Amino acid sequence: MTLDHPTPYYLYDTGLLQRTLDAIHAEIADHDNYHVHYAIKANANPGILQQISAAGLGADCVSGGEIEVALRSGFPAAAIAFAGVGKADWEIRRALEAGIGMFNVESIEELEAINDCATSLNLPARVSLRINPNVGAHTHDHIATGRIEDKFGIDMEDMVPVICSIQSMPAVEFTGLHFHIGSQLLVMDDFEALCLRINELQEQLDREGIFAPNINVGGGLGIDYDTPDVHPIPDFASYFSTFKQSLLLRPGQHLHFELGRSVVAQMGTLVARVLYVKRGKQKQFVILDAGFTDLIRPAFYGAHHAIENLTAAKEQRTQTETYDVVGPICESSDIFQKNALLKETRRGDLIAIRSAGAYGEVMASTYNCRPLPAAYFA
């Protein structure tokens, strides 16, 4: 489905979003101690956030701005987890004033800042410690977050001393452990490795007589960018069953998940129009009116998105040609796909760039003084 609106624009399938949310609920329905938080950073469109909050998910926020957006969209403050390696004092204060559920703390220095802010406001701060589990993940280097060389989290050997240090912080309450090893993960072995590492750390806590009420395993579940119509809903069954089978929770513990891409990616399509088909000596270029200012993932990560010529499909064109699909931005990296096989493409054709619901609209920019893309719902 497309709309008679100026391009480029994002088109969101709210029906698919609801089916995705229903699939998540189906997997955790028998586990009252399982809690899913939606990662606001994946897509902060207000209409999407309102639908997700109405479905009962919590929110995973990484900035004060995201906390504000989450609250305005109906997420209960108590269901908000505030992560991020660099929290400013004003963000910490706003989170405390809002009464969020927990901070996911990434360093002893941050812990001290939270205690100072909470003490000055005479408000309690519930904190989980983000531990770097040194677990590699099968994903792009830019979105792997759980290795020893990454900037995120507290080293494993520092876990117990940092927890003990909280005893001297009157405004801080230790509420659990937080982990996140990466994004766009499709190999369940990655999550199993995380479970085994958490089990090891829990045994260490047991020996020290420390109980972590909450275990937050982050997110990271990937989606099928190649054939979105074949797998419109991610493999939540395998994802959740990995934790059910491999993670050894203690009695009374709650398990938290932070899902973003897997919730919203497939519901979004970037619709663009062909400005020109440029025929060079070695290449044919399809030049769109959308660029990396509208969808930066291909330029930033080398990410793949399925691309379809909607007009050619409607007109039932049969000839297939090879094109480089590019944007109008004055940068050589403004490429959506090289050597794309498309039905014969002409000036004015509508092009769909699929699986663009996550890290698409939310990462758009006004570089080259270009307007931000519009968004519509179907």
Where are these regions (language model features)?
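Active-site-proximal loop/turn and secondary-structure-junction residues that shape catalytic pockets
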Residues: I40-A44, G65-E66, G86, S107-E109, ...
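Charged (often Lys/Glu-rich) extended helix/loop segments that serve as interaction or gating elements
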Residues: T2, T242, Q253-A378
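Short, glycine- and charge-enriched coil/turn segments that flank and shape catalytic ligand pockets
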Residues: D30-D32, T119-N122, S168, E208, ...
